[in-house]
């Protein structure tokens, strides 16, 4: 444990995250956040934290999702089982039990938002991905993978994007 800990990341500058998750333990000495900690205006959308979040100093903050100046959260979820930390934000976040998070219904709920995403980075569209879940993968929690496609043209497009990512060509 050291200082402030975050399940995915911590930054002084702006964070914009979508379709992220943390299932691991996050433990800090003077603060802990399940997904992100930042000092700037930031946002998290369609994400979840199912991991345990703890802080050594009981007078310090431990939050399931995020904390920061002007942090906006949309359509995100945290583990609400007894004994877990508070979400850390007032709106845009919903508690779900471990049992609820390990269901196909939870993956479907996440997909309702992901399917309409307009986020695109380096030609890669988040809407081309889907939340899926299997008992034997990721501890039974949802994770993202490329959607199933009905045409070979769509498959070729995704393969080209993957090849560009591997080679660093943009």
Residues covered by each model-derived region:
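Predominantly extracellular beta-rich ligand-binding scaffolds that present long acidic/polar faces
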Residues: 1-170
């Amino acid at each position: 444990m050291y200082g402030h800990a975050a399940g995915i990341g911590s930054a002084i500058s702006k964070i914009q995250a979508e379709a992220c998750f943390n299932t691991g333990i996050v433990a800090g000495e003077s603060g802990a956040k399940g997904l992100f900690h930042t000092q700037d205006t930031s946002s998290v959308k369609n994400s979840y934290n199912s991991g345990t979040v703890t802080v050594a100093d009981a007078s310090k903050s431990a939050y399931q999702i995020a904390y920061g100046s002007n942090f906006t959260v949309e359509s995100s979820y945290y583990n609400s089982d007894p004994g877990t930390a508070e979400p850390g934000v007032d709106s845009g976040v919903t508690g779900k039990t471990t049992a609820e998070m390990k269901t196909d219904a939870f993956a479907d709920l996440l997909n309702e938002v992901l399917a309409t995403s307009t986020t695109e980075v380096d030609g890669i569209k988040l809407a081309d991905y889907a939340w899926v879940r299997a008992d034997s993968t990721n501890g039974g929690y949802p994770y993202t993978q490329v959607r199933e496609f009905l045409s070979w043209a769509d498959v070729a497009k995704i393969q080209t994007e993957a090849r560009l990512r591997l080679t660093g060509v943009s």
